[in-house]
Amino acid sequence: MSNSNKLIAEKNGSRYGRMIHPWLRKKQDMLADTPSRREGMTYEEELSKRQQGGVFIFDIAMQLTHGKGEHGLSGVAATLFNRFFNVHSLKRCDFRDVAAACVFLAGKNEDAPKKLKYVVTQLWQFKYPHNKQFQSEQHFLDQCNVVTLIEDVLLKTISFDINVDLPHQYVLKLMRDVEKGRNVYKDMVKTAYYMATDVLIITDWSVRYSCASIATACVNIAAFFHNINMDDIVPFELSDRWYRLEDQSMTREEVEAMTKEFLDIFSRNPQFHIGSLKKIDPLGKVKIVGMPPQVSSTVTPSGSSSNLKKIDLESYKGRPKPLSNSSDSPSTRPSFLPDVKNQKVVEQELMEQRMKEAAQQKIHRNGHRPSSSSHPLHHHSTSSSASNNSNHQNRSSSGLSAHQHQKPYNEDSRSAKRSMMYEETNSSKKPRIDYKMSFVASSSTTIATMHNDHFSQTTHQQNISTYARGVNEMMLNQVAPPPLMSVSAQPSTYQKMCMEYQRNPADSRHTMSSTQQISPPDEPSPPVSQILLPPPPPPPILPPRLDEMEEGELV
């Protein structure tokens, strides 16, 4: 057996040793004197803040562990959280930042460290649910600095006493001694194990009771929810001392007091529990008196059972209205469905519909009829204006015929429209300057008139302001700017050389040598007479070698 296993066996299965400092306090002391109490906060307000911090810790742990190992991480972090606020007041700092620092330190303590950026990201998302993204990188760095600073303060506050023991292992050991291998209370064991995490989060028992005492209370609470009496399921020899198996100082009265306190918190604060109330209390033995949990569904069932029955069409049309405060007697609700069984009613409705259609057609026909007396300024003297007027009449007549026959426009009518609209495609296009717009002021309306020459519109000069007339005259009398003076560029050296070569064509009769070199255009070139160089000398004649000479040949 290794040394670590020997140490665990000597500590009766406990992973950690005893706490260095006496963190456990009695409830009377916490009611009388705590840092938050000195700041004017009551015990109920302090307990509510501790519960909010515990739920905040569990939410962050669930996101970081993805549902694997959240009980150990959240239990250690909640214990560190309660120890911290036994020394500091809840009014001095934000409990959410302290909760994130406790999670960060608990990950290191449980040999499962979490990265700081993940902890800070989850802290920001739960702290600001409506703005889950950091505004800038500086906000992220500032929040990281806050968490690390609180972690240092937390370590100094608890004097590096990070030996946090959890009640979960004591729950399993106690149920193993009670069942004696029967394995018939699996659901009760699961509930007790879940309660070991729940009580650390929604109560301050981690700084009031030992882990063995908390485990005993969790087993008794689970037995209460499952309607089981512990004295009936324990062996006969353990019937009077089963609650002292893990903690010799526990009494039956203390176990009952802890159970009653948890049930009171359970009934007054159901929103702080980390699980479903139906799973915790399947039999509904505890009456909820506090704020009920939020229901996701917004549909409320109707109180009348008649609405859930299937009825025929006649009953649906003539069903009575529900009773209201204004009227004492029920009245028949008017139906929006036509009575198809009565032939007279159907014929009457058809006649009314036809009369409405005829009235609409008459109004439409009167609205599109051209009147020459009402608008004398709309007459045009050119063929283009006449063609436009005829096109408008054709469109209105075609629209009337289509409305009378209740038929949509076909492709022939559309093609006819296109031909009339684009019949002057070969005409010359007017320049854009000729299209000048102006308005003629009538008695109450402004009528736009388009002339046949350049489609201009006339207006009264008195309607134009003085500033507008001045701007118009300035634009008309504006003198065109003088043309830019042409600057003669001096010829480059290369251009001068080419010009000189063109003036002296006799130099081109000389044959150019292979070694002739012409300077680049940017550099000053020598005269053309110096460009032609003499040919290179002939190669030297070497005497033949001795080994290549034949016999009898003279050197």
From Swiss-Prot:
It holds the Pfam family Cyclin_N. GO terms for cellular component: cyclin/CDK positive transcription elongation factor complex; nucleus. One of its GO terms (molecular function) is cyclin-dependent protein serine/threonine kinase activator activity. Residues 341-359 have a biased composition (Basic and acidic residues). Residues 521-543 have a biased composition (Pro residues). Keywords: Cyclin, Transcription, Transcription regulation. GO terms for biological process: embryo development ending in birth or egg hatching; positive regulation of DNA-templated transcription, elongation; positive regulation of transcription by RNA polymerase II. Residues 315-429, 505-555 are annotated as: Disordered. InterPro entries: Cyclin-like_dom, Cyclin-like_sf, Cyclin/Ssn8, Cyclin_N. Residues 321-335, 382-398 have a biased composition (Low complexity). Disulfide bonds: none annotated. Regulatory subunit of the cyclin-dependent kinase pair (CDK9/cyclin T) complex, also called positive transcription elongation factor B (P-TEFb), which is proposed to facilitate the transition from abortive to production elongation by phosphorylating the CTD (carboxy-terminal domain) of the large subunit of RNA polymerase II (RNAP II). Belongs to the cyclin family. Cyclin C subfamily. This is Cyclin-T1.2. The lineage of its organism: Eukaryota, Metazoa, Ecdysozoa, Nematoda, Chromadorea.
